[in-house]
């Protein structure tokens, strides 16, 4: 079969609109990929990145009797068709076929596939680990064993363009992030081209930088209702889409990006003004990167800090939850989310934030368990009222959220989670719930490992 980039539909190959479960291929969680880097830093292991050439064409077909009309330039006599002998781009089952094929080859090399995250693999004999995102691989382990694994993957899966991060200064690209090895760990940074594209779309190439990404106080005006022109709406959505790719590594802008995302359906002039302020902030912080440098060994391997801003928006009075998950002192996950339910008190909104943090912590601990690393995460909140609800028995006066209260209480009683109090000034998740003044933002961002620009 000829190898062409064009999808099968252009060759007269028809598929049903909706597939089935055999067409769904998984991708690894970004926090789990960051955990691979942190684990390598803790153990002093090497890291290698690479991608497989012609991945889909390597996978055997999961369906039978797939035929295609040859393209006109092939010069095939009319009435003849091609029979597909392998998967190909455009075939719905191709991603799943490649996923299973690559997993089987990795298992032949002695790597066990994770059950919680099927895109992670580990070989306990020499502590070699691998994460696979489609045809891209991130692998860690002792240098000698990792070299052998790269050679084996090159032979079995045609792994190419291998970049080795063995010494400080080595760097490579994985997905849309630049990974660089430094003394004691790694740094992660989004592509600079994304910032350049945003500034170009908004006509801000020569603009001056702002010191904060968003303004806390906004006076109500007609700009709140004035819709953008169709062309400006398209630019708005394109810019916010690029910001969303930068967000996982930039906790300092996640809250602002969340606010911008709410205007995606019908962006207004006010939304555009917010976007331009965010873009000007990126001018002065384009060099900021997230450092993954493990701290001093501690019993608290996994820590989660959560916070909430109660009823912060007058439009719907829904609160905002923020959280940061640390693994060996390194930020592997952070989030800023609108709460789905209205909270009747600040304690209730903080309880919702604890619930979100608990789910993230338990999921991450489950993944670590498959690495034979048994941990009990610790959740920190600055709300004494919410922590009191968790530490007592029964919902008390909060009968309307009984299940949430009882779940947190049960996880604490089963010692699956620990809970602790943190001072408001030291709660790093505070910047994920509301706009911050300059000094406060610099302090919190520096505490979570952001480096470069205004951050130490």
State each model region's role.
Residues 1-456:
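Long, low-complexity, charge-biased intrinsically disordered regions
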């Amino acid at each position: 079969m000829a190898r062409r980039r064009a999808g099968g539909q252009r060759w007269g190959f028809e598929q049903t609109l909706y597939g089935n479960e055999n067409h769904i291929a998984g991708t690894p969680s970004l926090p789990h990929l960051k955990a691979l880097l942190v684990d390598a830093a803790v153990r002093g292991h090497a890291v290698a990145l690479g991608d497989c050439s012609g991945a889909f064409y390597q996978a055997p077909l999961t369906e039978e009797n797939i035929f295609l009309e040859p393209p006109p330039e092939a010069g095939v006599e009319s009435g003849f068709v091609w029979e597909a002998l392998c998967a190909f781009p455009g075939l719905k089952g191709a991603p799943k076929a490649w996923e299973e094929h690559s997993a089987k080859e990795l298992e032949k090399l002695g790597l066990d596939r994770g059950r919680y995250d099927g895109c992670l693999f580990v070989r306990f004999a020499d502590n070699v680990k691998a994460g696979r995102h489609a045809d891209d691989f991130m692998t860690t382990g002792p240098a000698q064993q990792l070299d052998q694994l790269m050679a084996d993957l090159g032979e079995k899966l045609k792994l190419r363009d291998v970049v080795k991060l063995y010494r400080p200064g080595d760097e490579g690209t994985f997905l849309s992030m630049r990974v660089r090895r430094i003394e004691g760990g790694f740094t992660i940074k989004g592509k600079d081209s994304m910032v350049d594209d945003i500034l170009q779309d908004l006509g801000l190439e020569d603009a001056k930088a702002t010191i904060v990404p968003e303004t806390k106080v906004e006076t109500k005006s007609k700009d709140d209702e004035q819709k953008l022109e169709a062309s400006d709406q398209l630019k708005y959505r394109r810019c916010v889409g690029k910001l969303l790719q930068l967000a996982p590594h930039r906790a300092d802008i996640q809250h602002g990006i969340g606010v911008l995302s709410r205007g995606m359906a019908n962006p207004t002039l006010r939304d555009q003004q917010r976007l331009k302020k965010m873009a000007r902030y990126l001018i002065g912080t384009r060099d900021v990167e997230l450092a993954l440098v493990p701290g001093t060994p501690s019993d608290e391997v996994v820590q989660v800090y959560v916070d909430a801003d109660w009823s912060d928006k007058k439009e719907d009075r829904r609160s905002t939850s923020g959280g940061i998950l640390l693994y060996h002192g390194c930020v592997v996950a952070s989030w800023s989310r609108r709460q789905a339910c209205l909270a009747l008190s600040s304690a209730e909104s903080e309880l919702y934030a604890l619930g979100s943090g608990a789910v993230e912590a338990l999921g991450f601990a489950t993944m670590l368990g498959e690495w034979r690393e048994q941990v009990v995460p610790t959740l920190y909140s600055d709300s004494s009222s919410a922590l009191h609800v968790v530490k007592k028995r029964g919902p008390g006066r909060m009968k309307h959220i009984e299940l949430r209260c009882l779940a947190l209480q049960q996880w604490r009683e089963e010692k699956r989670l620990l809970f602790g109090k943190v001072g408001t000034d030291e709660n790093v998740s505070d910047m994920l719930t509301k706009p911050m003044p300059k000094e406060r933002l610099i302090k919190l961002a520096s505490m979570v490992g952001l480096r470069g620009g205004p951050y130490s």
